[in-house]
């Protein structure tokens, strides 16, 4: 019988079964939390992959719609490629684990997290994070440091570990913390302008719970853990390394002290050519090894400059932001544009406003079924001056787009205030670090230019870190550029407003961050963010008073909910006819609110009138001007409103006897009619003679009033 090991996290049971499933995997296990169950399988190749200069770790997060009792939409009716949310979850699992593998380990490692059952009170991504760490610890793969993961919410001023669905809906913070028992490894957050001190307290609150989960994983590891494989670590031939360093170290060092990037890169390119000329004969098959040595030499020099000389490659102070320029409204036909430049990083963001029917439909394991605001991020090869095929967005592009989207989401106006679907596209035109944060800035500029009444402008900043070997010295860098990102120990991205933080994402290349480092980074990021916001304010201080003349206009009206069927009609016949006649887009909400969107105001007004006519209450005793639509031998049918017809019986057509209806009216005639009855089947009975009589009486009364 399989033994299930369990612990308690936030008052709920976390269970692990290490022997029930995945017998042929290096480690196959089930991990459950409440009714959420995730299958974890971890495997590694027997030998290192040849010809690469990176660690090939692959995290796959597989959502199965049967986990929530759904059948996939579309024609195929099975799961296809991972959803954006699944990709984001996979990236989040990867980040805290990758730095904890041995340096030089180049075996392929794959961890597959398959979501089998979802209880909406217990998030499957958090369960998968803990399961991935534990599976690697139990396996023979050389990974020995458990990582605990929790979600943290903030409700009524109180922190909550792994908030349930009700608490998540009320929470002003959606924070994920991953940590070993000693240090924080990774943080992701979306927040409603949470101040820095509260954000720091939330991270530490989550860290304390992560420690307990990491200790629990250690217990499971002791009981079920396999003997670890001896890793075959990549190492450059010592003689080759000594020769390359001796030949190139001083030249590279001189080059790294050149402040101008173009000039520095030109010198470094010349050094590469000299290296090839020098070592092409003796080490013809070791080009990748030479490149690895050169990379490590550059890294050593840049880190030495920062730690020992307190000097950055581009000459800036540690807390200095690169030069900033902002521009809006430069694409004439776009609904809103923002061009944000920071140093050699440049991002153009374009806003498109659409109807509420343009929302993105989501088909995943969560409760959210549509998205009205979306942000997409493109990173073409030309942004770094390179040549490569242009394909669809990769995981990195999806991740960066989601981060910028998260930073602005709490600032987007509600549907009732601004009834548009909003799509932002950030095009990276030039990249020298921190493009995701430049996307936040560019998006803010574009939204303001488009006339979107966002709550407050937001900006983003990427912070870096370099540490000594023993971690005793820590130097925090503001607004890191490319080299500082490549050779540094941390990428700490913070987005927010002048009031507080709206998004965080940080990960490290070392074994975690100290509490002191996290606190200082948040404080310095705030200072930089306020500086950037002031620069942006100088460009466009507030949103435009109106949306672009090229953007569609939205008109809103409300009808009784029981009249919705009259507007839609059988099989959508009525609403489709209105759309065809007027060229508008129509969205109807369950509460009877109707949104009519059109680039042509006349078309919108026509559609609104038709809907008003369709839904206006017909009152007994009221007189209407109607059009004769059909004649029978017993009377005439008259349309008094769009789609509303009544019968004028032949006896009600005139004061005298009528032998033929055609003697009084013809099809197409406009006549006054009075509603004399609406029967219990909703049929409307009309009278022409009563309408004439009442009209004549009204005219006489008006004449009498004038005489007096």
Curated annotation (Swiss-Prot):
Main location: cytoplasm
Cofactor (UniProt): Mg(2+)
Residues annotated for Mg(2+) binding in this entry: 485, 491
UniProt-listed SMART domains: KH, S1
Keywords assigned by UniProt, alphabetized: Cytoplasm, Magnesium, Metal-binding, Nucleotidyltransferase, RNA-binding, Transferase
Reaction catalysed by this enzyme: RNA(n+1) + phosphate = RNA(n) + a ribonucleoside 5'-diphosphate
Record-linked Pfam families: KH_1, PNPase, RNase_PH, RNase_PH_C, S1
UniProt xrefs under Gene3D superfamilies: GHMP Kinase, N-terminal domain, K Homology domain, type 1, Nucleic acid-binding proteins
SUPFAM superfamilies: Eukaryotic type KH-domain (KH-domain type I), Nucleic acid-binding proteins, Polynucleotide phosphorylase/guanosine pentaphosphate synthase (PNPase/GPSI), domain 3, Ribonuclease PH domain 2-like, Ribosomal protein S5 domain 2-like
Region (Disordered): 689-708
S1 motif domain mapped to chain residues: 621-689
Subcellular location as annotated: Cytoplasm
EC numbers for this chain: 2.7.7.8
GO biological process per UniProt: mRNA catabolic process; RNA processing
Family membership noted in the UniProt record: Belongs to the polyribonucleotide nucleotidyltransferase family.
Protein purpose: Involved in mRNA degradation. Catalyzes the phosphorolysis of single-stranded polyribonucleotides processively in the 3'- to 5'-direction.
NCBIfam families in UniProt: polynuc_phos (TIGR03591), PRK11824.1 (NF008805)
Protein name, UniProt field: Polyribonucleotide nucleotidyltransferase
Species of origin: Clostridium kluyveri (strain ATCC 8527 / DSM 555 / NBRC 12016 / NCIMB 10680 / K1)
């Amino acid at each position: 019988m399989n033994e299930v090991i369990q612990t308690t996290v936030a008052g709920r049971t976390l269970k692990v079964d290490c022997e029930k499933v995945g017998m042929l995997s290096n480690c196959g296990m089930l991990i459950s939390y409440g009714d959420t169950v995730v299958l974890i399988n971890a495997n590694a190749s027997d030998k290192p992959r040849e010809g690469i200069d990176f660690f090939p770790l692959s995290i796959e997060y597989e959502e199965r719609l049967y986990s929530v009792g759904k059948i996939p939409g579309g024609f195929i009716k099975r799961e296809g490629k991972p959803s954006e949310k699944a990709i984001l979850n996979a990236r989040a699992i990867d980040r805290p684990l990758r730095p904890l593998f041995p340096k030089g380990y180049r075996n392929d490692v794959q961890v597959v997290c398959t979501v089998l059952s979802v209880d909406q009170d217990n998030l499957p991504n958090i369960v998968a994070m803990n399961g991935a760490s534990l599976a690697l610890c139990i396996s023979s793969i050389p990974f020995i440091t458990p990582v605990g993961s929790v979600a943290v919410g903030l409700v009524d001023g109180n922190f909550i570990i792994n908030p349930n669905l009700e608490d998540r809906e009320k929470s002003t913070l959606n924070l994920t913390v991953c940590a070993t028992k000693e240090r924080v490894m990774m943080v992701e957050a979306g927040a409603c302008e949470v101040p820095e001190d509260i954000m720091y307290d939330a991270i530490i609150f989550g860290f304390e719970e992560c420690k307990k989960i990491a200790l629990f994983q250690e217990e499971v590891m002791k009981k079920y853990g396999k003997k670890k494989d001896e890793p075959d670590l990549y190492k450059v031939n010592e003689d080759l390394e000594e020769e390359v360093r001796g030949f190139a170290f001083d030249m590279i060092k001189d080059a790294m002290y050149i402040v101008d990037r173009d000039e520095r890169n030109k010198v470094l390119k010349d050094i590469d050519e000299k290296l090839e000329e020098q070592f092409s004969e003796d080490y013809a098959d070791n080009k990748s090894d030479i490149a690895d040595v050169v990379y490590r030499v550059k890294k050593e020099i840049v880190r030495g400059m920062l730690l020992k000389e307190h000097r950055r490659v581009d000459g800036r102070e540690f807390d200095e932001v690169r030069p900033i320029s902002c521009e809006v409204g430069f694409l004439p036909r776009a609904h809103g544009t923002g061009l944000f430049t920071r140093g050699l990083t440049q991002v153009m963001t374009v806003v498109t406003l659409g109807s509420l029917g343009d929302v993105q439909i989501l088909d995943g394991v969560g409760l959210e079924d549509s998205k009205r605001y979306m942000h997409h991020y493109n990173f073409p090869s030309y942004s770094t001056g390179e040549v490569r095929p242009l394909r669809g967005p990769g995981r990195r592009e999806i991740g960066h787009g989601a981060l910028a989207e998260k930073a602005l989401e709490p600032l987007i106006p509600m549907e009732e205030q601004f009834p548009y679907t909003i799509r932002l596209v950030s095009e990276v035109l030039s990249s020298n670090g921190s493009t995701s944060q430049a996307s936040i800035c560019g998006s803010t500029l574009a939204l303001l230019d488009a006339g979107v009444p966002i709550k407050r402008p937001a900006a983003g900043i990427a912070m870096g870190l370099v540490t000594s070997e023993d971690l005793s010295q820590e130097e925090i860098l503001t607004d890191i550029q490319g080299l500082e990102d490549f050779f540094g120990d941390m990428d700490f991205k913070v987005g927010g407003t002048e009031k507080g933080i709206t998004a965080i994402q940080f990960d490290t290349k070392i074994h975690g961050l100290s509490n002191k480092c996290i606190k200082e980074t948040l404080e310095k990021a705030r200072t930089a963010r306020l500086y950037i916001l002031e620069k942006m304010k100088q460009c466009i201080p507030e949103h435009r008073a109106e949306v672009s003349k090229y953007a569609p206009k939205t008109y809103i009206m409300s009808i009784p909910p029981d009249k919705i069927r009259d507007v839609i009609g059988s099989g959508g016949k009525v609403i489709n006819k209105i759309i065809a006649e007027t060229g508008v887009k129509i969205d109807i909400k369950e509460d009877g609110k109707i949104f009519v969107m059109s680039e042509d105001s006349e078309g919108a007004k026509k559609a609104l009138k038709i809907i008003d006519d369709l839904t206006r209450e017909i009152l007994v005793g009221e007189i209407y001007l109607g059009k004769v639509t059909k004649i029978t031998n017993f009377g005439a049918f008259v349309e008094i409103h769009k789609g509303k017809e009544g019968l004028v019986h032949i006896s009600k057509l005139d004061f005298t006897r009528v032998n033929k209806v055609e003697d009084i009216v013809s099809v197409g005639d406009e006549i006054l009619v009075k509603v004399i009855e609406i029967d219990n089947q909703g049929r409307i009975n009309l009278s022409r003679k009563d309408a004439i009589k009442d009209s004549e009486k009204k005219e006489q009364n008006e004449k009498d009033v004038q005489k007096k």
